[in-house]
Amino acid sequence: MATTTAGLTDLKFRVVREDFADAVAWVARSLPTRPTIPVLAGVLLTGTDEGLTISGFDYEVSAEVKVSAEIASAGSVLVSGRLLSDITKALPAKPVEVSVEGTRVSLTCGSARFSLPTLAVEDYPALPALPEETGVIASDLFAEAIGQVAVAAGRDDTLPMLTGIRVEISGESVVLAATDRFRLAVRELTWVTTAGDVEAAVLVPAKTLAEAAKAGTDGNQVHLALGSGASVGKDGLLGIRSEGKRSTTRLLDAEFPKFRQLLPAEHTAVATIGVAELTEAIKRVALVADRGAQIRMEFSDDTLKLSAGADDVGRAEEDLPVDFAGEPLTIAFNPTYLTDGLGSLHSERVTFGFTTPSRPAVLRPAGEDDGANGGSGPFPAAKTDYVYLLMPVRLPG
């Protein structure tokens, strides 16, 4: 819980600059750009015998981090989060000394000195308590999985169901999914449940979850708290706890689209190619395409031809070797969405699965048996823990 007692105003501490700057920056990232009340733009600094706690809260998202510091005098103070973040990032690599003097905060680092106004700490809301822990996952796996699906999440706040990541929990199995209507990313993984036989599905803001996932990589494990038993998700809150950090976010009250029916069970054609060479070629060819315009992909037995542009803006083509099976195929995609998908695979090679040029294509990490298959379809969709489904762009004519 955050301390909001008005009497604690004589805070004084000394802290390592890098630790302080990193902690303030992490908390400040969750602060609202346009706070509904002035105090929500602040970060709360609280010093106790246990060290320094830095926290922020805007009624939607909370963030709290503990930092090792020499506390000369316990107390708490509220200051502008973004200003403090900018200052601490610019300080020299020397110890930082902070003290409260009346209604101002004095900050000294080497020969640099700052005097900042304080905000009304007594008006600052208490941070919400974390729900009961639901499960634990390795921090690097958590960060990778969230990053792979967050790339497909929508950014239009008028469509809240598309700005979230759907988290489906079934015992030790977790499925993450996100879509913006043009692409869909789905990742399956396992974790250690600490709340018994859990069956639940919640929708978490993608931006907040992605930030929390990146922050959790400095520890060994990430603890997720949604409640236990029948209460999972009922608080409308997700809590995330990792090494010295904890955060909460309100769940989205929206219905995520039914996505499993979009994943084809078989393909009429498949193609396998190196991710790096394809990505670089797409970037080159797309230089003549207007922003958001299409890049065409023509697949034949052993060649992929990339092309883009028109006579009035310029044309570009590039041929790449490819392992292809099925009838020759021409399909077009938004180049940005395509490279986003390739980058999220975390694989040296990608396998495309096609049905028709007007239907979504599936991108997945290539398996050992992919490539140089030959033959004709249909080809059953391979089992994989990650898929990126991408809508094509209508071809001219």
Curated annotation (Swiss-Prot):
Domain of life: Bacteria
UniProt keyword annotations, A-Z: Antibiotic resistance, Cytoplasm, DNA replication, DNA-binding, DNA-directed DNA polymerase, Nucleotidyltransferase, Transferase
Short name of one Pfam family: DNA_pol3_beta
Family according to the record: Belongs to the beta sliding clamp family.
Subunit field text: Forms a ring-shaped head-to-tail homodimer around DNA which binds and tethers DNA polymerases and other proteins to the DNA. The DNA replisome complex has a single clamp-loading complex (3 tau and 1 each of delta, delta', psi and chi subunits) which binds 3 Pol III cores (1 core on the leading strand and 2 on the lagging strand) each with a beta sliding clamp dimer. Additional proteins in the replisome are other copies of gamma, psi and chi, Ssb, DNA helicase and RNA primase.
Localization, UniProt: Cytoplasm
Single Gene Ontology BP annotation: response to antibiotic
GO cellular component, as recorded: cytoplasm; DNA polymerase III complex
Function: Confers DNA tethering and processivity to DNA polymerases and other proteins. Acts as a clamp, forming a ring around DNA (a reaction catalyzed by the clamp-loading complex) which diffuses in an ATP-independent manner freely and bidirectionally along dsDNA. Initially characterized for its ability to contact the catalytic subunit of DNA polymerase III (Pol III), a complex, multichain enzyme responsible for most of the replicative synthesis in bacteria; Pol III exhibits 3'-5' exonuclease proofreading activity.
Note: Strains that are resistant to griselimycin occur at a very low frequency (5 x 10(-10)) and are associated with amplification of a chromosomal segment containing this gene as well as the ori site (with a single point mutation in the promoter region), suggesting antibiotic resistance may be due to overexpression of the protein.
GO molecular function term, any single one: DNA binding
InterPro entries: DNA_clamp_sf, DNA_polIII_beta, DNA_polIII_beta_C, DNA_polIII_beta_cen, DNA_polIII_beta_N
Official protein name in the record: Beta sliding clamp
